[in-house]
Amino acid sequence: MILEYDGVVVDFFEKFPAHWKNIGIHVSGGADSALILYCTALMIHSRDQLNEVKIWPTISYDAAAPNCKVHNIGKDVVKYIQDLPIGKSIQNPYLHTYHQTDIDTESNNTYLREARKYLFNIIGCDTVLDGTTRGMPGLPRPTGSYDPNEEELIAMTKQPGIEFVFPFATVNKKFIAAQYNHFGLKDLSNMTSSCVISSASPCKECWWCKERYWAFGSYDGGVQ
């Protein structure tokens, strides 16, 4: 399964090792991680490995905001894909809280220690996939948000010796939107959330709302 858009190719899902038996995926509630969950499940299904390979989603949420919409969206995303014919390899999500001071600083990602402990020490995952993508041309991410440089992004897509893999590290949100269109995943797309404001509707002003509109032609939920 090779993903393509505008001359750019992502072949990670075609080439990921057949011997991987336990794959962790951090589901943030956003469009990137939801697509990774879908594509991984689809690849396992197409390889006829449903009885051999398991996907272990994790959902993290701020202990200070346990009812944050992203927490609930993450659960909805997992359930939606689980219920598809391709979703039988997806296990129920592991939910855990975190505090802003509980960030893993031992590597170049922001995975939480609790997720690492669960996925590697308890489950024994072969790898963990994350939905980091490139930003928008000409509009840098806000100060303080994770924005790796080109060299780091390329390194993230390499599998050997790296625990956390970022399949979409070298593509932007327009590539992601094109895949949702290709697979006919409008309902799943509208379920995901980009806005960082915890409210019932997208703010349309934050960087992530602008990125969403730039790529999808609409805000969260298909809002214009």
Model-derived features: positions:
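Nucleotide-activated chemistry modules centered on ATP-dependent adenylation/adenylyltransferase
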Residues: 1-224
